[in-house]
Amino acid sequence: KAEEEVEKNKEEAEEKAEKKIAE
């Protein structure tokens, strides 16, 4: 379902942002 994809993408984007901040 499209909504599930959006949620997954949002979570992945947040994880990437956190990793960037941690570096």
Swiss-Prot record:
<feature type="region of interest" description="Disordered">
    <location>
        <begin position="1"/>
        <end position="23"/>
    </location>
</feature>
<comment type="function">
    <text>Gp22 functions in head assembly.</text>
</comment>
<comment type="function">
    <text>Internal peptide VII: Cleavage product of Gp22 that is incorporated into the mature phage head.</text>
</comment>
<feature type="compositionally biased region" description="Basic and acidic residues">
    <location>
        <begin position="7"/>
        <end position="23"/>
    </location>
</feature>
<protein>
    <recommendedName>
        <fullName>Major prohead-scaffolding core protein Gp22</fullName>
    </recommendedName>
</protein>
